[in-house]
Design a protein with these regions (language model features):
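Nucleic-acid-binding surface
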Residues: 52-144
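Short beta-edge/loop segments at beta->alpha junctions of small alpha/beta modules
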Residues: 1-72, 108
Length: 145
């Protein structure tokens, strides 16, 4: 029954996607609660989940999660600099820029911090990076500074 979840892999999914995977169920909320309680999915925030990597066999991407957790957004600041290997320090909070209000999230996967940036500066110097089977948005090294 959970073969569909394994196929999703590391991509964050919403409650409505889970509903579409199990159309035979009348109450998707109960299915979500059951999947979470039994460790098949991990809740990032209300309505957004990832398949547990122990179950899917796929490594989770903090970059991809950051892009989905508070969209529109892209990886920036020290997180981007660390991704490019420009700073030696470990990054414990994944930093991103967003068009929305600044906000922080603490999830079982990690901590995510979003800072507001004006619309006219948002897309300048942002690139799409491919990593394995997925892609995410990240600031160029120059913009991340």
């Amino acid at each position: 029954m959970n073969r569909q979840l394994k196929e999703i892999g590391a991509i964050p999914i919403t409650t409505s996607i889970i509903e579409s995977l199990y159309p035979e169920l009348k109450s998707a909320d109960k299915k979500v609660v059951w999947l979470e309680k039994n460790g098949y999915i991990i809740r990032l925030k209300r309505g957004l989940y990832v398949v547990n990597p122990e179950y899917s066999g796929k490594t989770l991407s903090n970059e991809l999660i950051a892009n989905h957790l508070y969209a529109p957004s892209y990886i920036s600041m020290s997180t981007a600099l660390r991704y490019y290997g420009l700073i030696p320090e470990a990054v414990y909070t994944h930093q991103s820029m967003t068009l929305k209000h600044s906000r922080s999230f603490q999830t079982p996967i990690g901590n995510y911090d979003y800072k507001y940036i004006a619309r006219d500066a948002f897309s300048v110097g942002v690139r799409s990076m491919h990593k394995g089977e997925y892609a995410f948005l990240i600031a160029s090294p120059e913009k991340a500074l």
